[in-house]
UniProtKB/Swiss-Prot annotation:
SMART domains: ANK. Pfam families: Ank_2 (PF12796). This is Putative ankyrin repeat protein R787. It comes from Acanthamoeba polyphaga mimivirus (APMV). ANK repeats lie at residues 56-86, 96-125, 127-154, 156-184, 185-213, 214-243, 244-273, 275-303, 305-333, 334-363. SUPFAM superfamilies: Ankyrin repeat. Keywords: ANK repeat, Repeat. InterPro entries: Ankyrin_rpt, Ankyrin_rpt-contain_sf. The keyword Repeat applies. The keyword Repeat applies.
Amino acid sequence: MDSMLIVNPFDALDQEFYHSLPPELWVVLLNTSIKSSINLAFTCKQFFQLCFLLKSSTNVIKLAVRNGCIHILKYIDKIKLIDTSHSKNTRFELSDIQNYLRKACKYGHLSVVKYLVGRGADIKAEKSYLTGPITNGHLEVVKYMVSMGVDFRYDDDAMLREAALKGQFEMVKYLCEIGSDVSSKNNLTLVWAIIGGHIDIVDYLISKGADYRQINNPLAWACHHGHFNIVEYFVDKNVDIKADDNLALRQAAENGHLSIVKYLVDLGADINAKNSCAIRWSSRQGHLNVVQFLINQKADVNAKDNYAINHACKKGYTDIIKCLVESGAEFKHNNNYCLRIAAGKGHMSIVRYLVEKGSDYTDLDNYAIKSALCNCKFIVAKYLINCGVDLRDNNAYILRYCLKKSSIPTKLRIVKFALDTYHDVNLITNCFASITK
């Protein structure tokens, strides 16, 4: 290591300069969570000589900025005045200074922010510089940026909305105190606070004039995101739980928030509103506990042309299908549509269940196995063959149909499946001869 250091361009550096470094510099370095691969470099007085020897592309300045090491940044500047030939990983390039500023703002290192501004960084170059410190709650950095003239109200108070969404209560209060409008963009800040689930901010914004009555169903927003306390908050304010054809209940059901569903039903929400949308949407999204509750409340399982079971079959929710069937859902409707869609999607457990319950797997000219083959769902196809379907029947009509309709890669996979199943090359040859006529 010593021989390597002799040829290093930093050997000529005045050693007195190292010895004159403030002790707190090394304390900061030792206590900073910087990547272990350069810890030695950060704690050795031959710091930049070691950085020069590093083969990694580690950007020392970037790490120093991220970790708030203001002493390192000042040291780099001081070194540059003595020798500008040091490693590219320790150069303070003005072309990168704006990126460094963005990171310093994001991580809340006020001293670094001020230093970079002093070095020429333009704190007003991008309005988005505010986003990082606001969403991460770095209030002092935001105050400094505002004092430097950064526009905190751009895009109709976008920063206030960001703070509300992220739950930065103190930031919200500060922005309101210096002039942000809680009602901008049709009370959108309040909507974002509801979405984020921050009831303290919701209450504060309303106290400052945000009008929840001008929002398109604030209760539904809270239900959609599962924020029970905000649901109760708006119920206490006499918001109509049945507004927009019971949208609040539908949103809670679709997103699986059972406790909210029960709460709204207890308050009188209509489970069968809009063609029993609550059970339809909860079935489509796979929320078994909500489906079971709604069934116990006498929801119509066959509403809107058997929507609930159709979509459960499409998505592959076996438990929900069983629950619906046991509660009277029609599963043979529309020429055994449920079986056909499950076969094409490859949902083997559903296919088996429906066949065992009596679904006709040969309906519509054996549509189920044709759908399975064309979608390369060969486990389902094998099961249906075991149930009695024969691809060789009717001059191999099923096989010819699938080969004709499929892409070349799918054709090859179907051919392999047929050969593995019947071990008959002539079967394949005759099929191709027929479909190419």
